[in-house]
A protein has these predicted regions:
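Short beta->alpha connector loops
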Residues: 10-12, 76-79, 100-101, 126-129
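Short hydrophobic segments within beta-strands
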Residues: 6-7, 36, 74, 123, ...
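N-terminal Rossmann-like dinucleotide-binding module
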Residues: 1-51, 66
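A contiguous active-site-proximal alpha/beta segment in oxidoreductase catalytic domains
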Residues: 101-158
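Rossmann-like dinucleotide-binding domain that binds NAD(P)(H)
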Residues: 161-203
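Beta-loop-alpha module in the N-terminal Rossmann-like domain of NAD(P)-dependent dehydrogenases
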Residues: 49-112
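Residues at the starts of beta-strands that form the adenosine-phosphate
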Residues: 3, 30-34, 93, 119, ...
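Short, well-ordered alpha-helices that flank and scaffold nucleotide-derived cofactor binding pockets
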Residues: 14, 18-26, 85, 89, ...
């Protein structure tokens, strides 16, 4: 049996829950999925509750919980550090939605939140797509002097049926805002060209 803990079941957390359930079914694996939630009274997205074994708001009874094979941290970015601290040592592997912490938390020492040897994956998949891998393989030996990346996105379209003004993506203090929430572009730029020496924000 595969055991998984979900911290945060908004749109992306629910998608990961449904995907994991489907993958386990395809592979003939039994799945126990639990959810650590901030508010049990808040309704889940359609179909999510049926896929969960248990829901709770605290880990105080963690002795009664299984040691999880996998934990998904998919709550608002500003709460990731707190979640990592709460579940420290409770899961063999971690799936952390990007980015790990918000812009206001860049002084967080991740070594205090992740035990030595902890397996963790941050969801920044664009660097692994075929086009990016081909470009990265083509770059060695070249001396690029300029790169232009354009990213167009319309926040009201991100979560159909949800008022975009109420979600963390619309609030910098919660880890939202274009500079940090659209981190995929920054991630693959750094992967391709290295860490920038200077960053300018032109408004």
């Amino acid at each position: 049996m595969l055991t998984a803990l979900f911290i945060g079941l908004g749109s992306i957390g629910t998608r990961h829950l449904k995907n994991l359930t489907a993958i386990c079914a395809q592979r003939g694996l039994a799945l126990r999925a639990d959810a650590l939630r901030s508010d049990l009274a808040r309704p889940l997205r359609p179909g999510a509750a049926d896929l969960l074994h248990s829901q709770f708001t605290t880990l105080q009874d963690s002795a009664a919980l299984p040691h999880y094979d996998l934990a998904f941290i998919t709550n608002p970015t500003s709460l990731h550090a707190q979640a990592l601290e709460e579940i420290r040592g409770l899961a063999d592997a971690l799936f952390i939605e990007k980015p790990i912490v918000s812009a206001e938390q860049t002084d967080v020492d991740l070594s205090t939140l992740l035990p030595a040897g902890q397996k963790a994956y941050v969801a920044a998949p664009m660097r692994w797509c075929g086009t990016m891998l081909a470009l990265k393989n083509h770059l060695p030996g070249l001396r690029p002097y300029s790169a232009r990346v354009i990213c167009s996105s319309y926040l009201p379209d991100w979560r159909p049926g949800v008022d975009y003004r109420t979600v963390y993506s619309a609030h910098k203090a919660l880890g939202g805002g274009v500079t940090i929430d659209l981190i995929h572009e920054w991630d693959y730029l750094v992967d391709l060209f290295g860490v920038p020496e200077t960053i300018c924000n032109i408004r």
